[in-house]
Amino acid sequence: MGFRMVLATSASVTALGLTGALLPTAPSASAATAPTVSDVRFGSFNLSSVSFDNAAAGDHRPWLKRRPVVVSQILGQKLDVLGVQEANQSKIYARSVNLGINQYTDLRNALNVAGGHYALTNEHAYNCVKPASTYKCVYRNQGASQDNRILYNTATVTMLSQGSVKYRTQTAGKNARYFEWAKFKVKATGKRFFFSNTHLDPYSAATRRGEWDEVIANTNRLHGSLPVISVGDYNTSKFAGYAARYLPKMKRAGYGDVLNQQYAQTVVKTPRAERVTRGWINSYNAFRRDVRHYSYASARHKVGNGIDWIFATNSLRVKEWSVVTNVDLTTLRVQGVLPSDHNLVRATLVL
């Protein structure tokens, strides 16, 4: 689940007196934003682990109740590459899935049963000689990355290579955190790109800072001359103190936020994305149906305080960025089953 301490509501931020310039409006589709063969659609989605099913209550429904909405949103957004977090890798929750041996294979298969054409960059659950479990594990690097996984649309992109790196910086006694990466080629154009996915530690700001440094170091080491798209749950809102350092550091490294958000500013003064959809809603919802608790519902020119990010090579054109949620804009309540305690975030880039 997401890091509660970084969740900022519009009320709390208003109390700080923080203001900014206007966001770009969300115009109707035009020649400038209409889909082209060069468009590639990316996303990041923290699924909320199936391991939490035993605690599911109220609007936090079990995985099998949430999965149809997850599938519908992913397919509806026509994503080419998606980074997912909390897609549990263990077989011990077999009773909570029915289309795979664990949560990420269950999701992959559910997407394809519904008409998708998705594959995982790596299906190995663990870095063991026998990678299906950790029982009597003999270490072997299988490229596994715990519950952090990359899905890609085989109809639109081809995977060229993939791997993962376990961060040196970890919080003792907690789940290991990984940097997961892959290189792809767009079938329609032949363009290649580097994609990474991560879920930074939720327990320690010091650990997150160390892991973020490793995101940059690993990206710089691995991407070569390819454009970069880096997504994930960074457990960091733009109001976290260290965001003042790391948001500019990502941009200086060559791959800034696709919205061009700045530390502690509620509105983007120099927009990068040409179109923003539901940008006033936070990416973390805590399984709450009323979006007024985690958005700027009364000031929709502002950007929500998300902890899920999409970074991309600074020179790439960003056609659109969106928070995906089934919110009724009249009642400000999410309709139907909430798919996760996070909202899917996605961006359309031109390669």
Show which residues each predicted segment covers.
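Structured beta-strand-rich core segments of catalytic domains in phosphoester-bond hydrolases
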Residues: N88-R192
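N-terminal, active-site-proximal structural segment of metallo-dependent hydrolase catalytic domains
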Residues: F3-V13, G20-V113, C128-A132, R140, ...
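Metal-dependent phosphoester-hydrolase catalytic domains
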Residues: N220-P227, T236-L351
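Extracytoplasmic/secreted proteins, especially bacterial periplasmic and envelope-associated proteins
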Residues: K65, V69-Q73, N102, D106-N109, ...
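Active-site beta-strand/loop signature of hydrolases that rely on acidic residues for catalysis
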Residues: F42-L47, V70-G100, L151, A182, ...
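Loop/turn elements at helix/coil->beta-strand transitions in domains of secreted/extracellular proteins
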Residues: V37-R41, Q77-L82, V113-L120, T156-T158, ...
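Solvent-exposed loop/turn segments at secondary-structure junctions
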Residues: L47-S51, A87-K91, A125-V129, T156-V157, ...
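Active-site-proximal beta-strand elements of phosphoester/diester hydrolases
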Residues: V37-A57, N148, S161-V165, W181-K183, ...
